[in-house]
Structure formats: C-alpha cells, structure tokens
C-alpha cells in the first residue's frame, strides 16, 4: 500500500535516562563501553547511518546531561538536540515531544539507548507499517517453552505462537499521537504501545531479529561485545 503521507518528517527519540542500577555499576549503562565505544554512541551512530531525513532528540537523565552532551555532541547533526528527561520513561518521552513540532503525517520513533543492534532494514519496515497502521513496534518471537509461575512453581504454560517479546523502536503517526495526548493517562504507561492500548488502539508488529538486545546487565554487555562482529554481517 502506498503511503498517503508523502511529506512526512521522521523524528527519533532516543531514551538515555538510565542510572546503572540494574547493571550494578556506578556508571550509567549508556556510558559503558563495548568495542571501544559507549553503548549510547553505538546506538546514535546506527541511527545517523540510516539514510533518511530525520531529527534525533537524545533524552538524558538530568544528572548526566553534561556527560551526554560531551560524549554525543560530535555525532549530532544541526537539527538534533539533547534534553533532560523526566522521572519516568513516559515522562522522558513527553519531555522529548516538547522539543518537537509534529504534524499529523509525521512519524515518531521511540528507541532505547541500550539497544544498539537494531537493523536499518527494520527501521524501514517499521516506518512503512506506521504509515499504514498508525502505531507499530518491533518485537521478536521465541522458540522456548513459555511458562507462568506462582510462588516459585509452574502455574500454567502459555501458547508461544501468540507470545512476542517487545523491542524498540516503537513508532506512531502524528495524527494518532495527537489523539493520545488529549486522553487521560491513568495509570502512567510503561511504553508507547501500552499507552496506545489503554486508549483502545492496538499496535501492529514488525518482527525483529533475535539480536536486538537491550543491554541491562553485565552479562548483556559481554554478549554485546560478542554480537558486535556478528552484527556487522547482518547489516
């Protein structure tokens, strides 16, 4: 299906508000390095290599705004910017939105700074899906048996054919975003797709490759080092 919106702009919010708690590090995880560069720079460079006209907004934890500016400024284009985030993920997203003027036909992508391995072709597919469906997310399937537990014991087994693991970016078309912004938010949503679902809007799914890892723990950082060479072959 051809896009109805031919003059769209693409905006990318990269959420980099981590403090290193789950990583068990005094250094926020987005500043930890693999392959000789901080995670955040790997992610930023990935989006800068995407040959689309876009504006990138880096949303940083307020305590680390100067570090973010120092590390990232050399990799930002003139239209890009760095702003302080909020107290929650959703609050940070709203802060990022405040820096933008989004029209109905535009596309907004929201991405975790700790996911440096998204593929450019996935970004293209995601945008196509957003144009057609309004809201979309990357997600991946599992080949594992999926169970639910209660008090540390198996409670039930879930049908993995209908189980997807949410990834990012998640994205939304401007007209749908404008509608969501007029609605009450109770409870505070954890991400874009849960926000949309509370308003009765379902997100379409674009399958992501299995290495679209969110670096959260020390073991993930070790995996990222290993994945880095492999990822170059997937590009």
From Swiss-Prot:
One Gene Ontology molecular-function label: 2-C-methyl-D-erythritol 4-phosphate cytidylyltransferase activity
PANTHER family: D-RIBITOL-5-PHOSPHATE CYTIDYLYLTRANSFERASE
Physiological role: Catalyzes the formation of 4-diphosphocytidyl-2-C-methyl-D-erythritol from CTP and 2-C-methyl-D-erythritol 4-phosphate (MEP).
Similarity section: Belongs to the IspD/TarI cytidylyltransferase family. IspD subfamily.
Record's catalysed reaction(s): 2-C-methyl-D-erythritol 4-phosphate + CTP + H(+) = 4-CDP-2-C-methyl-D-erythritol + diphosphate
The protein's annotated pathway: Isoprenoid biosynthesis; isopentenyl diphosphate biosynthesis via DXP pathway; isopentenyl diphosphate from 1-deoxy-D-xylulose 5-phosphate: step 2/6
Keyword presence, Transferase: yes
Domain of life the protein comes from: Bacteria
Keywords: Isoprene biosynthesis, Nucleotidyltransferase, Transferase
Name of the encoding gene: ispD
Organism: Leptospira borgpetersenii serovar Hardjo-bovis (strain JB197)
GO cellular component, one term: cytosol
Site features described as Transition state stabilizer, chain residue numbers: 22, 29
Biological process, per Gene Ontology: isopentenyl diphosphate biosynthetic process, methylerythritol 4-phosphate pathway
Positions of the record's site feature: Positions MEP for the nucleophilic attack: 160, 214
Class in the EC hierarchy, top level: transferase
One Pfam family in the UniProt entry: IspD
Protein name: 2-C-methyl-D-erythritol 4-phosphate cytidylyltransferase
């Amino acid at each position: 299906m051809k896009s109805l919106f031919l003059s769209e702009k693409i905006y990318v919010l990269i959420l980099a508000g981590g403090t290193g708690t789950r990583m068990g590090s005094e250094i926020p995880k987005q500043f930890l390095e693999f392959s000789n560069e901080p995670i955040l720079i790997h992610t930023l460079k990935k989006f800068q290599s995407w040959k689309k006209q876009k504006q990138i907004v880096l949303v940083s934890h307020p305590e680390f705004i100067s570090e973010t500016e120092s590390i990232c400024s050399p990799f930002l284009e003139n239209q890009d910017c760095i702003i302080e985030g909020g107290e929650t993920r959703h609050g940070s997203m709203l802060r990022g939105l405040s820096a933008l003027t989004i029209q109905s036909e535009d596309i907004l992508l929201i991405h975790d700074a700790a996911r440096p391995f998204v593929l450019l072709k996935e970004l293209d597919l995601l945008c196509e899906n957003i144009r057609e469906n309004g809201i979309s997310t990357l997600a991946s399937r599992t080949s594992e048996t999926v169970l639910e537990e209660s008090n540390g014991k198996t409670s039930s087994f879930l049908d993995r054919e209908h189980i997807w693991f949410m990834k990012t970016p998640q994205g939304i078309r401007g007209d749908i975003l404008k509608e969501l912004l007029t609605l009450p938010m109770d409870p505070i949503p954890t991400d874009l797709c849960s926000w949309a679902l509370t308003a009765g809007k379902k997100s379409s799914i674009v399958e992501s490759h299995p290495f679209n890892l969110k670096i959260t723990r020390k073991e993930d950082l070790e995996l990222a080092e290993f994945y880095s060479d492999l990822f170059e072959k997937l590009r």
